[in-house]
Amino acid sequence: MRLDNRKEHILDFIVRDFIGTAFPVSSGRIKEKLYRKQALAGSPATIRHIMLELDEDGYLYQPHTSAGRAPTEKGYRYFVDNLMEIGEPDYGIRHTLDEIIDNFEEEADSVFDELSRALASHLKLFSGIGFLDEGRIFGHGLPEVLKEPEFFENDVAVRFADFTENINGNIKGLADMEVDANGFGVVKMVFQDNDFGECVIFSAGPQRMNYEKANSVIKYAAKDIKKRKNKKHG
């Protein structure tokens, strides 16, 4: 069931702003950045009331030390399912992926390893490609992810490291993971390849990850693989 327009506008702004800043979002910031920019009517009291309703409905929560709100798992899921806009990745990463995939005549393992490193470097997330039929995976980027503020607490960093280990040991489980798996964010695309069978390209990180950017890059990489790898079978 969809939220009404005002709630969607505010939830969309909070998710995007929190992804970009890692700071809880106040009603004053919404009034300044969203309502003035889009010329929407609404007093700070009205905005606070809508935020409270989103909080009570489970889309937002209030961190103990802040007057602002941040998205919950439910809030992120609603954003991904209903509000996210996926366009083409920027030219730089498209060019990089094209060059990597064009080298499929070389050793496939080295190409997939380079692809995983490129995804991890661009997205700053634990990223890679796995092969479900073979039960193997190429994944990189854990050190970069652990620089995010969510992982400054050692126990959270350890949990995420364990999470990535579980990905390495359970490729089929990765293909079935939801966007908010185990308290972390996951973006993935499963596709079929003529030579390698069922494959999954993925990125994983904190829930406060850029889902639009990750989705656009992963979809482009999967399309690139299918287009270039399968054209010899066409």
Region roles according to the model:
Residues 1-13:
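Short alpha-helical segments that sit at the start of domains
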Residues 2-3, 22-23, 108, 153:
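Residue-level marker of regulatory loop/turn positions in helix-turn-helix DNA-binding domains and
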Residues 2-3, 42, 71, 89:
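Alpha-helical hairpin
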Residues 10, 72, 203:
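Conserved RecA-like P-loop NTPase ATPase core
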Residues 11, 55-58, 197-198:
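Short acidic (Asp/Glu) and glycine-rich catalytic loops that position anionic groups and cofactors
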Residues 14-18:
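Short helix-to-turn junction characteristic of helix-turn-helix DNA-binding domains
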Residues 20, 24-82:
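N-terminal helix-turn-helix
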Residues 77, 84-234:
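Intrinsically disordered, acidic Ser/Thr/Pro-rich low-complexity regulatory segments
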